[in-house]
Regions:
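Terminal leader/tail segments of proteins
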Residues: 1-126
């Protein structure tokens, strides 16, 4: 994880302000180059109410920031990858489903997917 990502996402986890070269947070929202890529309901520290998006920019940097957030929030078994110019949500390195570059995904949805994957022998793989 890049130092900038670690700094910003650790502050976001704690609900604190932080700024770096390309990314900043007010503790409730994370912006990359001015685009909102993560948000939590104000004054709420329930991880299920945290949401993230590629904000229309499926770049290496956007995916790295999102994956860093997932790691800091304890969701390191999930990630967002690109394959053949398509974005995918992965669980333990396996594609779960495609992701639209403007789609908003919540950590609550990841909790649900994790439970489904653990409780089912059928895979949800794309």
């Amino acid at each position: 994880m890049r130092q900038e990502t670690q700094k910003i996402m650790s502050a976001f986890l704690k609900g604190e302000k932080a700024s770096a070269q390309r990314t900043n947070t007010d503790g409730n929202t994370v912006w990359l180059h001015g685009n909102k890529i993560a948000h939590r309901q104000q004054d709420t520290y329930d991880h299920g109410l945290v949401q993230f998006t590629l904000a229309g920019w499926p770049t290496v940097t956007t995916r790295e920031r999102i994956n860093g957030m997932l790691d800091v929030f304890g969701y390191s078994d999930f990630g967002v990858i690109q394959k053949n110019l398509n974005q995918y949500l992965v669980y333990k390195g396996k594609k779960v489903r495609s992701v639209d570059d403007r789609e908003v995904i919540s950590l609550a949805e990841l909790d649900h997917l994790r439970d489904e994957m653990k409780n089912s022998r059928n895979t949800l793989l794309v």
